[in-house]
Amino acid sequence: MDKIIKSISKNGHFRAFALDSTLTVKEAQERHQTWPTSTVALGRTLIAGQILGANEKGDTKITVKVLGDGAMGPIIAVADSRGHVKGYVKNRKLDYKKASTGEVLVAPFVGNGFLVVVKDMGLKQPYSGQVDLITGEIGEDLAWYFLSSEQTPSSVGVNVLLNEDSDTVKIAGGFMLQALPDATDEEITEIEHNIKSMPSIATMLTSEEPLKTMLDNIYGDMEYKNLGEFPLEFKCDCSKERFLEGIKSLGREPIEEMIAEDHGAEIICQFCENKYEYSEDELKALLK
């Protein structure tokens, strides 16, 4: 099972999350049948959603939108505070452009644009924050969002490693580190050095204790407390009933057209690819 470990330095000056999201991204790839570059971009956005969701409490829903002008098109992830995430990428069929390290580059396909984060806390108006994409590689863009919109200095790393022979997901995960108000400049410099000199996310995720390895590398000589492990998973909350309500909201005329022309309806959820079919009788019942 995928999981996240939440932690805080013993002096209370820093906090960090470490995530193993391998099964989450695998399921997304299988459901959407994405090609390599699209898989990595969607996977990173899903992990970003899980990081933001882990920051929240209660029934808050987080929507992450990567809105670039490149060939990728929009990438959307919706997460909650319980570790659930769902998402999709507009262009599923983008293939390799590798860096010299062998990692897949997504920025050339994301292009220029915005990272938008919407927090729905069940109040009248959801909170929405928007920043420019500074790299298009997702992790750095999320760190910029935290600094720009939430005034919290942060470092974020997210990555997806593919099996070279099959283009399926081998491993996926990431981390978030945030400096809290009492952190000194000296401590921040120390943590920055740790993050710059630590192994790649892919290397750490393939170690024996991946999440502990990640946190040990982030904190270095600084002592920290493990605040607990929490499950993560790809989970969509769509249902036949929910989509039926959506059809009902279209009004009489479109429903009558569906009955006359198609003798029913079929809806495919864009977040998870589940298919729902509605008979003529089910549609007629909406008109009563």
From Swiss-Prot:
An example GO BP is:
protein refolding
Q: Which GO terms describe its molecular function?
A: protein folding chaperone; unfolded protein binding
**What keywords were assigned to this record?**
Chaperone, Cytoplasm, Disulfide bond, Redox-active center, Zinc
Pfam families given in the database record: HSP33
Main localization of the protein? cytoplasm
Name the InterPro entries for this protein: Heat_shock_Hsp33, Heat_shock_Hsp33_C, Heat_shock_Hsp33_N
Q: Write out the annotated subcellular location.
A: Cytoplasm
What intrachain disulfides are recorded?
Answer: C236-C238, C269-C272
SUPFAM superfamilies found in the cross-reference section: Hsp33 domain, HSP33 redox switch-like
Q: Coiled-coil regions in this chain?
A: none
Record PTM: Under oxidizing conditions two disulfide bonds are formed involving the reactive cysteines. Under reducing conditions zinc is bound to the reactive cysteines and the protein is inactive.
GO CC annotation terms, alphabetical: cytoplasm
- Domain of life of the organism in this record? Bacteria
Family as reported in the entry's similarity comment: Belongs to the HSP33 family.
Describe the task this protein carries out. Redox regulated molecular chaperone. Protects both thermally unfolding and oxidatively damaged proteins from irreversible aggregation. Plays an important role in the bacterial defense system toward oxidative stress.
According to UniProt, the name of this protein is: 33 kDa chaperonin
What species does this protein belong to? Lactococcus lactis subsp. lactis (strain IL1403)
Top-level taxonomy: Bacteria, Bacillati, Bacillota, Bacilli, Lactobacillales
Gene encoding the protein: hslO
